[in-house]
Amino acid sequence: MAKLLLGKEVTDALNANLQTRTAALREKGIVPTLGIIRVGADPSDLSYEKGATKRAELVGVEVKKFELPADATKEDVLAVIDQVNADDSIHGVLMFRPLPKHLKADQNEICNRLAPQKDVDCMTHLSNAGVFEGLGDLGFAPCTPSACMEILDYYGIDCKGKNAVVIGRSLVVGKPAAMMLLGKNATVTICHTKTVNTAEICKNADIIVSAAGVLNSLTADYVRPGQVVIDVSINWDENKPNAKGGKGAIAGDAKFEEVAAIVDAITPVPGGVGSVTTSVLMKHVVEAAERA
């Protein structure tokens, strides 16, 4: 059975580090602060907002919420972004996306209105460019691929000279994860829906980051002994036993039992990457405050 790369251990270490750093900032009179912009009241947004607020309180980050009605206009949203851009007490901003359907055509313009130094979840073009250029002090990488890197770092998984495969090419996970693995000196291949020999490519990898978003798409045919699997996806498996004794629970891309029986290490779903992302968001806010 593979070693489980548990997100809780990574999160606990991150939180302890952040508590020390926020205390040091507060001694200097700097209160690291996250601004949350939400248009409407989507249940998943509200759930994430609640979790983020709780995590912020734990590590010493303040939260300021900017709630707009579901029918807010482009001008309404831009006005709020201008407000947080001008507020020096706000160091990082999270805006829930996707925006409501009537703002879909304007989402690109709205996202890029945010000051890149406050873009803690990579929603501006400048932050995306920073990921491809190696970041430095230009914005922040998306929280999910950053969480993948935190897991690799925490468990001492050296990427240098390793073959890494990323399944998925989205701007949210796949592409930035590939760039970040390159930054760790891995040799990276991206597989996607048009790749014809994904299983063969994956078997030759040392590290697999799966962000396909397809239940049971990563099977025993894709893996071999010695590999590390980072399963990013959140899927619904109607046949998976749940905590209430019934069926229906979240799962990743990996057909977990058969893959875990072969590879050396794997992140579970739930309890893996997803549990680390909120602490990564707080880390980005703290880093933004330290840069300010």
Which positions does each model-derived feature cover?
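Short beta-strand segments enriched in small/hydrophobic residues
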Residues: 31-40
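Short beta-strand segments
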Residues: 38, 94-98, 167
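Anion-binding alpha/beta catalytic cores of soluble intermediary-metabolism enzymes, centered on
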Residues: 92-159, 216
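Short, well-structured alpha-helical segments in soluble
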Residues: 76-88
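Short beta-strand elements in bilobed, periplasmic/extracellular small-molecule ligand-binding domains
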Residues: 56-70, 188-190
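Positively charged, low-complexity intrinsically disordered leader regions
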Residues: 1-30
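Rossmann-fold NAD(P)-binding glycine/threonine-rich loop
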Residues: 108-119, 124-132, 233-292
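Glycine-rich phosphate/diphosphate-binding loop of Rossmann-like nucleotide-binding domains
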Residues: 39-53, 136-232, 237-240, 247-260
